[in-house]
Amino acid sequence: RRLGARRDPVVLCGHTHTPRIVQVAHDDGRTTLVVNPGSVGVQAYDDDDPYEHRVETGNPLARWALIERGAHGWSAALMATAYDCEAAARQAEAAGRGDWADALRSGRVGRLEREVVAVAAR
């Protein structure tokens, strides 16, 4: 629906931080490959704008997509690559953002904080 009358063979999008590939079929028989690679450096966050929501990939890997044009049209693959997430987390902590540091290390919102509370309660 959001593509409207567009019939591009490939549409790249982002901002949601959610890795996803969708093939959209149009009434005229053509298709559009819609690719969102996810996020390179923000694998988890929560927000209340425009509504309360949480996005988590479950690990700290940097996300990206490989898009190729072959004999049978376009294809895409979602990729994940390790990087020095600990260095990024330390930068977040130095900036006073422990919440971001936890997300950078784990790919989850508040996970490390919950684990610390659970261990302390034992």
Model-derived regions: residue spans:
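Active-site neighborhood of phospho(di)ester-bond hydrolases with catalytic His/Asp-centered motifs
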Residues: V10-H15, V34-G38
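Active-site environment of divalent metal-dependent phosphoester hydrolases
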Residues: L12-V24, V42-D46
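Active-site-proximal segments of metal-dependent phosphoesterases and phosphodiesterases across multiple
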Residues: R1-R6
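Acidic, His/Gly-rich catalytic cores of divalent-metal-dependent hydrolytic chemistry
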Residues: H26-R122
